[in-house]
């Protein structure tokens, strides 16, 4: 009887040790390795923008992640990714979290999110020479209107939900929907009010008249779904930095 009890105890201890090893938080890995790995697309100005000449990044996200790494006492490594594989990179452990991404039900099925620290409105844009053609959502949701979007993005799902009768053109990253519209290969694209303002300053595009954003879209970091230790750390860090005015100052720096 005593031998049976000893055997059971040993088995439970072995299982507990194995569970503890497999359940080690990304936080421990980051602190042990001295590196915070961040997945970023480098194509969402002014959130994250990659300079192909230097392979360096700049933007709102980049400042946030650099600050997070600094407070962790580690270096930051930006790992290139694209929108269609952004979530997969977190799930596969290629990086510890992502830069800013919209919170969606589809993404929540397989990944976790930090608390939101900024929100955006998603609205349609067209070129200035076509501005008079569009007035309201119904003017876009037609078979003779080509709406461009990027594969695997939350924008793709929104386009399909909002404009089911339109001719939807899906392009793969690094191509972007707005590029198709500027090149004359599509009529309308959707993007955040943040990126839209940047594009309006650089290209002959304009917001479609009389279309209100359905609602604000919360933005957060995508994180490993089961790693509550890491999620708790980041959420508390976000709350702390909000109190210090860091997020507000960073928004002002990038004109958000």
Question: Where are the regions that the model predicts?
Answer:
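Flexible hinge/capping segments at coil-to-helix
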Residues: 128-145
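Alpha-to-beta junction loops
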Residues: 36-37, 72-75, 91-100, 145-146, ...
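A ligand-binding cleft/hinge motif common to bilobed small-molecule-binding domains
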Residues: 85, 101-110, 158-161, 179-215
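A structural signal for short loop-to-beta-strand junctions that line the ligand-binding cleft
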Residues: 27, 57-61, 108-120, 207-212, ...
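Short helix-initiation/N-cap motifs at beta->coil->alpha
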Residues: 62, 77-88, 169-183, 215-217
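Extracytoplasmic small-molecule ligand-binding "clamshell" domains
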Residues: 24-101, 109
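Periplasmic-binding protein-like
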Residues: 119-123, 197-239, 256
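Ligand-binding clefts/hinges and TM-proximal coupling segments of bilobed small-molecule sensing domains
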Residues: 25, 154-169, 209-210, 238-256
């Amino acid at each position: 009887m005593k031998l049976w009890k000893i055997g059971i105890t040993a088995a439970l201890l072995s299982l507990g040790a194995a569970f503890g090893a497999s359940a080690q938080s990304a936080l421990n890995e980051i602190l042990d390795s001295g590196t915070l790995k961040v997945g970023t697309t480098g194509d969402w100005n002014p959130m994250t923008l990659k300079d192909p000449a230097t392979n360096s990044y700049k933007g709102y996200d980049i400042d946030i992640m650099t600050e997070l790494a600094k407070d962790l006492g580690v270096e930051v490594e930006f790992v290139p990714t694209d929108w269609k594989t952004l979530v997969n990179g977190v799930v596969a452990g290629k990086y510890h979290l992502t830069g800013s991404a919209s919170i969606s039900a589809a993404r929540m099925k397989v990944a976790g999110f930090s608390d939101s620290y900024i929100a955006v409105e998603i609205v349609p844009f067209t070129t200035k020479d076509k501005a008079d053609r569009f007035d309201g959502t119904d003017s876009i949701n037609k078979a003779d209107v080509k709406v461009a979007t990027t594969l695997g993005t939350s924008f793709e799902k929104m386009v399909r939900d909002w404009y089911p009768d339109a001719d939807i053109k899906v392009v793969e990253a690094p191509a972007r929907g707005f590029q198709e519209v500027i090149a004359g290969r599509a009529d309308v694209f959707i993007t955040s009010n943040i990126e839209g303002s940047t594009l309006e300053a650089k290209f002959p595009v304009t917001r479609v008249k009389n279309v209100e954003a359905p609602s604000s879209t919360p933005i957060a970091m995508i994180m490993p779904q089961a790693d509550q230790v890491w999620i708790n750390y980041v959420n508390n860090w976000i709350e702390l930095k909000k109190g210090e005015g860091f997020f507000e100052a960073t928004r002002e720096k990038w004109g958000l």
